[in-house]
Regions:
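Domain-terminus/edge residues, biased toward the C-terminal soluble/receptor-binding domains
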Residues: 2-191
Length: 191
């Protein structure tokens, strides 16, 4: 009583589980199995595992208060999506709604990593004349298909030796129009 979660909460938990414990898919993708030497059969209640291309899990549920619920995950290529339905009137409705959301995501969005090219910063009094600057964080963006973001890289004019791997050298900002989609530090690739 008094414990509630939103679809967003469930999606965040599902995302974190899949990101940090991908081995869970060893179990969540099993359609049917048997245990105890074959004397007991198990069927996955997530029907998408059998019938949806790329399905990787995740969890079905039902209570009289919450209705039929599903956190569904699927991967196609490098894109892994989560769809959550809470409060469906029937089991079939939860699967249909998640299938529709996953189809929409795969049809209308793509994973993009901005191309940063070769970026070098001069090193003053160093053994090497320059150091290569690379993004210091994840640069993958889930964007609507057809969106062509702009990339702006701002680097220090020069840095004094010694330079340490991971040392901040500037910033990469990815825009769509006036909106900042991503900002990550540009760091030294090596010492």
């Amino acid at each position: 009583s008094g414990h509630v979660s939103s679809a967003y909460d469930i999606a965040l938990m599902s995302r974190e589980l899949m990101l940090h414990h991908p081995d869970i898919q060893t179990y969540t993708t099993i359609w049917m199995d048997s245990v105890r030497g074959g004397s007991f059969g198990l069927n996955n209640t997530n029907k998408l595992i059998r019938f949806y291309q790329g399905a990787t899990g995740l969890k079905t549920g039902y209570t009289s208060q919450a209705g039929h619920c599903l956190s569904a995950t699927a991967r196609r290529g490098q894109m892994h999506l989560v769809a959550v339905v809470l409060g469906a009137d029937s089991s079939a409705e939860r699967f249909s709604a998640c299938r529709t959301m996953l189809d929409y995501g795969f049809a209308n969005f793509s994973l993009l990593s901005p191309q940063v090219g070769e970026n070098r910063v001069p090193v003053r009094l160093g053994q090497e004349k320059t150091v290569r600057a690379v993004p210091g964080g994840d640069t993958n963006l889930l964007l609507e298909k057809g969106v062509k973001p702009q990339v702006k890289i701002e680097l220090e004019e020069s840095v004094p030796a010694p330079v340490s791997q991971g040392q901040a050298l500037g910033t990469m900002t990815v825009y769509e129009g006036e909106n900042i989609l991503l900002q990550v530090p540009m760091v030294a690739e090596k010492s």
